[in-house]
């Protein structure tokens, strides 16, 4: 069997125009919401309704941000803190995708693999990362391995479960058609199962990435000397609220940018997903 291709999806011009208009409308609503939140933040701090110790004004956060970029905080600049966190998130996400997708395919496609692996994933998935953080430190020490491993475990479960769900929902007619043409098991996985499960896999990656960012602060509690989570925790101990707010905003912006990138990738790779037929 040489190749299997997914049929092209025909999109009507009228529906494309409507989709673009709806997208622009949604973006304007999102932008106005963001502007409104910043205005409320500024108004609350300008009228001294909340003391700067608890909520610094936007101008103070921006000034502190420039100071962190130029001189740094806790012996590292903002870029160094950001680079350390991104490397940990990137390694955790990369290893999770490389291992969770094959595991999810095995769970969704093989009864024995499902019986062995599914209970293990469901057993540890609800446990908060902070609960098994001490055990990881005992096993792996306080180096980078323990930080990346904690993030990896947090991201692994959502991707594996989403992949298994996508595999189980593959149209049996597609599998039978490919088998009738002489497809091997490897060809079925590559040309039928993976393309059909791709929307669920990408959704799992998006969910896992969000969980990974929320685990980052816990991971950087392990004897870290740099990283956004470390920066926020250190600033909180000394009540440096503007650094805390800045760190939270940077994490939110980076996570949001990654989420938008994954959404764009999902629209590019699986344009038919979510369309009304």
Briefly describe each language-model feature range:
Residues 122-158, 165-166:
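Generic hydrophobic transmembrane alpha-helix motif, especially the helices
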Residues 111, 168, 203, 246-277:
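C-terminal transmembrane helix and the adjacent membrane-cytosol boundary/short C-terminal tail
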Residues 17-19, 47-94:
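Periplasmic/extracellular loop-to-transmembrane helix junction in inner-membrane transport proteins
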Residues 91-121:
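Transmembrane-helix boundary motif in ABC transporter permease subunits
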Residues 149, 153, 185-219, 242, ...:
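Transmembrane alpha-helices
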Residues 162-207, 228:
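Short cytoplasmic-facing helical segments at TM-TM junctions of multi-pass membrane proteins
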Residues 1-35, 260-277:
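Transmembrane alpha-helical segments of polytopic membrane transport and secretion proteins
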Residues 62, 75, 79, 83, ...:
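Alpha-helical membrane-protein architecture signal
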């Amino acid at each position: 069997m040489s190749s299997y291709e997914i049929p092209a999806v025909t999109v009507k011009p009228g529906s494309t125009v409507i989709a673009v208009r709806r997208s622009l409308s949604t973006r304007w609503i999102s932008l106005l919401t963001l502007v409104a939140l910043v205005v409320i933040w500024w108004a609350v701090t300008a009228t001294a309704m909340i003391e700067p110790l608890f909520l610094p004004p936007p101008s103070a956060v921006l000034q502190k941000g420039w100071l962190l970029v130029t001189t740094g905080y806790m012996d590292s600049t903002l870029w160094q803190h950001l680079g350390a966190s991104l490397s940990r998130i990137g390694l955790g996400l990369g290893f999770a995708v490389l291992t969770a997708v094959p595991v999810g395919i095995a769970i969704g496609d093989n009864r024995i693999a499902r019986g062995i692996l599914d209970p293990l994933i469901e057993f540890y998935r609800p446990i908060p990362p902070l609960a098994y953080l001490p055990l990881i430190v005992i096993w792996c020490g306080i180096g980078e391995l323990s930080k990346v491993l904690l993030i990896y475990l947090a991201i692994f479960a959502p991707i594996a479960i989403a992949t298994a769900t996508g595999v189980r929902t593959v149209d049996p007619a597609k599998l039978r058609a490919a088998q009738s043409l002489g497809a091997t098991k490897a060809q079925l996985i590559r040309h039928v199962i993976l393309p059909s499960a791709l929307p669920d896999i990408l959704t799992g990656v998006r969910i896992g990435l969000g969980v990974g960012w929320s685990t980052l602060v816990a991971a950087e509690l392990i004897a870290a000397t740099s990283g956004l989570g470390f920066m926020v925790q250190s600033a909180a101990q000394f009540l440096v609220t503007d650094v805390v707010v800045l760190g939270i905003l940077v994490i939110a912006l980076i996570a949001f940018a990654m989420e938008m990138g994954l959404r764009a990738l999902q629209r590019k790779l699986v344009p038919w997903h979510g369309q009304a037929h």
